[in-house]
């Protein structure tokens, strides 16, 4: 009987140890699941949803010679071996957007030129090209934060400006001067252009937040309002359209995006 009791005790000890080890492993796994669930719940609670899965280009369409996913990050790159002839865009396939907010983070090399395109049309003369509003981003931070309208009215607000855009008669090109729309009226200052530039990290991660409501278009970088447009040009403005990310023609460059969250 004593031998049987010892055997039972040993077996119970082994089972208890196994359960303890299983519990430890399970708690680590559950912790990771819980953390992911909490993050997802937080995103859902404030209405934002992820539109980039961090794994592949599912839900996006573009020239894969220039776009890829690497280490959970969306990468657009131009190399000496693979130059770019025209601006190209990675276009979100979730449909057209009207009023929305978009948050994310970007990092760009010094020679880089990129931007987040929104309320845009396909420019069918060039593959993967868009025409419309753009939250401008560049590696030297000369333009980062401004509102530039690709293939249309050009600059609608420089960094540090709150503007009202008025309609103009005649052809588009006749109403553009020094790469800015002649109907651009500065209504107030949001800050000195160079002081605002100092808030943007060179060749490092920055956050952006676009708040697009009706005819008011706001671009935030690192939580600071960089430009604001009230578009009164009922002839040329767009109230809905496509969303995309740009790689600009020019020297070799690399731009990275992550944590893209959309709220409609």
How does the language model describe each region?
Residues 24-264:
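Carbohydrate-interacting regions of secretory-pathway proteins
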Residues 2-14:
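Bacterial N-terminal signal peptides that target proteins for export
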């Amino acid at each position: 009987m004593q031998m049987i009791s010892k055997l039972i005790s040993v077996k119970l000890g082994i089972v208890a140890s196994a359960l303890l080890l299983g519990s430890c492993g399970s708690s680590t796994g559950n912790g990771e699941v819980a953390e992911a669930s909490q993050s997802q719940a937080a995103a859902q609670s404030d209405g934002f949803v992820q539109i980039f899965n961090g794994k592949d280009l599912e839900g996006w369409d573009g020239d894969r010679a220039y776009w890829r996913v690497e280490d959970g990050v969306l990468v657009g790159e131009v190399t000496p071996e693979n130059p770019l002839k025209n601006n190209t865009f990675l276009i979100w396939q979730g449909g057209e957007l009207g009023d929305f907010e978009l948050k994310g983070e970007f990092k760009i090399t010094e020679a880089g030129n990129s931007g987040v395109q929104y309320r845009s049309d396909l420019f069918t003369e060039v593959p993967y090209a868009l025409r419309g509003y753009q939250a401008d981003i560049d590696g030297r931070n000369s333009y980062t934060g401004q509102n530039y309208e690709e293939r249309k009215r050009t600059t609608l607000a420089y960094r540090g400006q709150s503007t009202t855009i008025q309609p103009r008669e005649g052809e588009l090109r006749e109403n553009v001067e020094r790469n800015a729309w002649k109907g651009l009226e500065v209504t107030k200052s949001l800050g000195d252009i160079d002081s605002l530039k100092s808030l943007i990290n060179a060749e490092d991660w920055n956050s952006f937040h676009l708040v697009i409501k009706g005819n008011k278009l706001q671009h935030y970088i690192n939580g600071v309002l960089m430009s604001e447009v009230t578009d009164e040009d009922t002839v040329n403005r767009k109230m809905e359209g496509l969303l995309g990310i740009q790689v600009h023609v020019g020297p070799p460059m690399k731009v990275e995006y992550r944590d893209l969250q959309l709220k409609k």
